[in-house]
């Protein structure tokens, strides 16, 4: 049996790529904050941003204490990793200098590794996934969830839902631990970068939390329009940029797999944006800025699990399917009566399901996740039968059911103990004022565009003199 973590010398190129990828994935959370912040009303923008940013604090602390160990420790009962194995990241941070290499007379330095990477780099990379998964949920509960309840929910959900599910999906045998999770190693469902662990997981959690919390006051009779579409588009652009670290970085090496996933991610995202806009045009007669931004995110979500298993045509199919289906799915909340404020269910749950299941149809024999890989099959459209589709469906359903049940339990516990929701007066005032005693747009009152009723030539001359430090003398009467 190998001793974990394995000690060795990391690959410099892989390490550099993964450090950049980790930073790119972290950038996605501020991008999400802008994306969500622009979609709410002006009196909720700060709270929406705060929910994303605060997830960075809560999840990071828990990840360092026990989260990484639950996600990537040795498997315990097919449920989670050993929480004590890497408690406080023990055994992962440190340098062991050994005797000089006789051939070069230079000191070789062994450090804990995850594959070819320093273990600390892999810890950081996976932390960023945990952060944004929690932050995604916040979009479903805009305008009405107490901030303190959100912080507590974020910690509990990360502990009991995300960390175990990440173990199922991302903990491959012999990488960070000897025995990893069952979806990755026994079921052999393909989820390259988190269609199940991130998007289906967060999407169904958002649905459960929104149902327990209840509808916004006045919804759906009152339409809650985005207050800042430039914020929304800026957020979508940052998400697209950061997603290259998310998908291509999941190769964990600077190689052709990273390159292939970079390309398929780009193609699918572009196709999804066009698919969403076309759907809007046919259905509503207009193609909107919000639709373009939402289509971008839908494409990124759908290609996440499939980016290493499809070719160019497959990426186009994934993107178009996600753009059209997610554009249609966001209307389900009006028919079914649940208030998913910012369409987390329609984009992330539906998009994650689309991308995960399409692997079973479109997995190409030449793709990196299929070619020469044991335990997986080509997609149905390439003559592989239903085997891979069945694996994909079982993996997706397992995450959906587990996350849905545990999230429902956590939400109900919080509702009947500390309470989840603002009161009616606070909701009417606005959650920014009620929870943070701030407003995102206070500066507008003192805008430079507010001028005196009459400005004379003398006023202008005196103003210029004051700016350059000259004494202002009164004009003789």
Swiss-Prot record:
It is a multi-pass membrane protein. Residues 457-477 are annotated as: Disordered. Keywords: Ammonia transport, Cell membrane, Membrane, Transmembrane, Transmembrane helix, Transport. One of its GO terms (molecular function) is ammonium channel activity. Gene3D superfamilies: Ammonium transporter AmtB like domains. InterPro entries: Ammonium/urea_transptr (IPR029020), Ammonium_transpt (IPR001905), Ammonium_transpt_CS (IPR018047), NH4_transpt_AmtB-like_dom (IPR024041). Its main location: membrane. The keyword Hydrolase does not apply. GO terms for cellular component: plasma membrane. Residues 468-477 have a biased composition (Basic and acidic residues). It is found in: Cell membrane. PROSITE patterns: AMMONIUM_TRANSP. The chain crosses the membrane at residues 16-36, 53-73, 121-141, 150-170, 192-212, 229-249, 257-277, 290-310, 312-332, 344-364, 394-414. Pfam families: Ammonium_transp. GO terms for biological process: ammonium transmembrane transport. Belongs to the ammonia transporter channel (TC 1.A.11.2) family. Homotrimer. PANTHER family: AMMONIUM TRANSPORTER MEP2. Involved in the uptake of ammonium/ammonia (NH(4)(+)/NH(3)). This is Ammonium transporter. It comes from Mycobacterium tuberculosis (strain ATCC 25618 / H37Rv).
């Amino acid at each position: 049996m190998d001793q974990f973590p394995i000690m060795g010398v990391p690959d410099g190129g892989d390490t550099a790529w993964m450090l950049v990828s980790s930073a790119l994935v972290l950038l996605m959370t501020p991008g999400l904050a802008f994306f969500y912040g622009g979609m709410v009303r002006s009196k909720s923008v700060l709270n929406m941003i705060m929910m994303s940013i605060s997830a960075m604090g809560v999840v990071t602390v828990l990840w360092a204490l026990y989260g990484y160990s639950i996600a990537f420790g040795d498997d315990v009962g097919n449920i989670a990793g050993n929480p004590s194995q890497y408690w406080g990241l023990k055994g992962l941070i440190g340098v062991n200098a050994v005797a000089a290499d006789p051939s070069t007379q230079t000191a070789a330095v062994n450090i804990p590794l995850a594959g070819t990477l320093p273990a600390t780099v892999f810890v950081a990379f996976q932390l960023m996934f945990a952060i944004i998964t929690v932050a995604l949920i916040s979009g479903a509960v805009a305008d009405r969830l107490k901030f303190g309840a959100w912080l507590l929910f974020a910690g509990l959900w990360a502990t009991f839902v995300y960390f175990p599910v990440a173990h199922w999906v991302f903990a491959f045998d012999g990488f960070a631990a000897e025995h990893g999770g069952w979806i990755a190693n026994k079921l052999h469902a393909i989820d390259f970068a988190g269609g199940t662990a991130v998007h289906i997981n967060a999407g169904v959690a958002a649905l459960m939390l929104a149902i327990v919390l209840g509808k916004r006051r006045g919804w759906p009779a009152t339409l809650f329009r985005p207050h800042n579409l430039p914020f929304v588009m800026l957020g979508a652009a940052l998400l697209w940029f950061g997603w290259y670290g998310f998908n291509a970085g999941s190769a964990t090496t600077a190689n052709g797999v990273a390159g292939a996933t970079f390309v398929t991610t780009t193609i699918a995202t572009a196709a999804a944006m066009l698919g969403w806009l076309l759907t809007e045009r046919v259905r509503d007669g207009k193609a909107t800025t919000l639709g373009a931004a939402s289509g971008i995110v839908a494409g990124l979500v759908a290609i996440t699990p499939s980016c290493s298993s499809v070719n160019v045509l497959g990426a186009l199919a994934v993107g178009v399917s996600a753009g059209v289906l997610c554009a249609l799915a966001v209307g389900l909340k009006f028919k079914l009566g649940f208030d998913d404020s910012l369409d987390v269910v329609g984009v992330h749950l539906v998009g994650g399901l689309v991308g995960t299941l399409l692997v079973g149809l479109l997995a190409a024999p030449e793709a990196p996740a299929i070619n020469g890989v044991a335990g997986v099959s080509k997609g149905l459209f390439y003559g592989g039968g239903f085997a891979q589709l069945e694996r994909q469906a079982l993996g997706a359903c397992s995450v959906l059911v587990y996350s849905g049940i545990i999230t429902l339990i956590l939400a109900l516990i919080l509702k009947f103990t500390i309470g989840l929701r603002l009161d009616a007066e606070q909701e009417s005032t606005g959650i920014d004022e009620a929870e943070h005693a701030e407003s995102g747009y206070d500066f507008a009152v003192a805008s430079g565009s507010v001028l005196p009723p009459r400005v004379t030539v003398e006023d202008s001359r005196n103003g210029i003199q004051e700016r350059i430090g000259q004494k202002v003398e009164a004009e003789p009467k």
